[in-house]
Amino acid sequence: MATAASNPYLASSTILSSASLVHSESGGGGMQPGSGAVTSVSGGYRGDPTVKMVQSDFMQGAMAASNGGHMLSHAHQWVTSLPHAAAAAAAAAAAAAAEAGSPWSSSPVGMAGSPQQQDVKSSSNREDLHSGTALHHRPSHLGAHQSHQSAWGGTTASHISTITGGQQQSQQSLIYSQPGGFTVNGMLNPPGSLVHPGLMRGESPEMDHHHHHHHHQQQHPHHHHHHQHHAGVNSHDSHSDEDTPTSDDLEQFAKQFKQRRIKLGFTQADVGLALGTLYGNVFSQTTICRFEALQLSFKNMCKLKPLLNKWLEEADSTTGSPTSIDKIAAQGRKRKKRTSIEVSVKGALESHFLKCPKPSAQEITSLADNLQLEKEVVRVWFCNRRQKEKRMTPPGVPQTPEDVYTHAGNVSADTPPPSMDCKREFCGRLLKRCKFER
């Protein structure tokens, strides 16, 4: 059986007995007060807070297997992290040599209890350490059990206080892992400390466990509020989605809007001008036309629909009475009313056109007075008639006024021949056409 004298770290560490942190299988209990727990160091090291302990599940399992489930004294290796601890190395060596022959001594360095009081967990029970409850309470328990390393001035059998009853220790077992302060070969980083901050303040593991749960209880309302906020955002998004019209709604509204606009007697330009004057959004006639033809983008259609709907409601509610919409529409109507000419008046104009396609201003005035028409109406009619003649005459076929005159079937025999001005005008138009074709 290996003894404490064979410890390779004997020169800079003290010897700990085979007592180890033992899990109790009894229901509702934590660490048993009577069982072997972390023991204090011998004389020279008692009360020295610089000594730190390295625990290894692998070493515990190996030593337990080789000694029938009991741990030897060098299962725990004590490493000093400050240089002044090496001053008591001689005293530690002497104490270790004195106890080399009795590994189960009852001295302060030896076992705190009999080996029968220690229970070592089997490998099957260790698998239970990975359950959900153990993982949830891992940081608090780990910190609580590691904090007992600061109790250097205690008695020979310092034990871990039990946590509140009602929680099964089989599922909330201790989970030992390598802290962040470890380096190669289990040596400790001097700046790091494994002492729990709660015990440094004089608090107990129970208080730390309660504080851990209180911290979680404080975090849960925050998460609940966070979920409520997301729920509110989702409800707002769904509400905005309901307000957004679909393509079918836009198509149906555009069709109804066009029918109502025509029935009310407003042009597309009137609607665009009314929107700009009433609501501050100026739209052209082309935009209104493209809306009715569903040629705008979906985004622009959605923006324009509420304005047109508002205008349509106001126009429907004020039908039959002079409103601001009618006044605005009247201002927007820059085109004059279409003039309809009777058949008899149109024949007189046609006969005069055959004699002179481009009459002078005096001839237009005289003709307007005879036919009881406005001067502007007569002038526009002659302009339109000349454009029609150009479309009807095939290119490359020169015609004289006499040819036009003879081909006119509705011209009477007493119609005077065209004047020289008309002939000169007609010849000039033919010359221009010939030059253009060349």
UniProtKB/Swiss-Prot annotation:
List cellular component terms (GO): nucleus
Q: Does the keyword Kinase apply?
A: no
Which residues does the UniProt record annotate as the domain POU-specific? 242-316
Q: Return the Low complexity bias intervals.
A: 160-172
* Localization in the cell: Nucleus
Q: Which residues bind DNA?
A: 334-393
Q: Name one GO biological process term.
A: brain development
Task of the protein:
Transcription factor that may play important roles in patterning the embryonic brain.
Name of the protein described by the UniProt record? POU domain, class 3, transcription factor 3-A
Give the organism, scientific name: Danio rerio (Zebrafish)
Organism phylogeny: Eukaryota, Metazoa, Chordata, Craniata, Vertebrata
